[in-house]
Amino acid sequence: MNYWLMVVIFAGVYADGTQEAYVFKDPHFHTLNECVRNANDPNEIPKYAKKLVAEYGRMMQIQKVVCASQDEVIKTFGSKYAIGDPA
């Protein structure tokens, strides 16, 4: 099964042209619409912000949040982002 994952892309660009990003493996979603709804849900956003602060020790400026298929995430960030048995 191919899941959908929420990916936070932070503002700012490193000298090599890359950007810092965070992939939420939990929760993961079964459809794109489910991911988008969750990413825009005012009741859920504080949970994601809290997780980011726990990871980075501070709130980082966010450029954008996207929902990407597990396959796209694995191609971009590597197999450590696989969830269960890939489709």
What name fits each language-model region?
Residues 18-37:
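A short, exposed loop/beta-hairpin motif centered on an aromatic-Gly-Thr core
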Residues 1-23:
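Short aromatic-glycine-(Arg/Gly/Cys) micro-motifs in beta-strand/loop hairpins
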Residues 43-87:
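Short, mixed-charge low-complexity intrinsically disordered segments
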Residues 2-3, 29, 49:
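Generic N-terminal initiation segments characterized by hydrophobic and/or small/turn-forming residues
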Residues 5-6, 35, 65-67:
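Hydrophobic beta-strand residues in large extracellular and virion-surface proteins
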Residues 15, 19, 25, 70-71, ...:
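Intrinsic disorder/low-complexity signal
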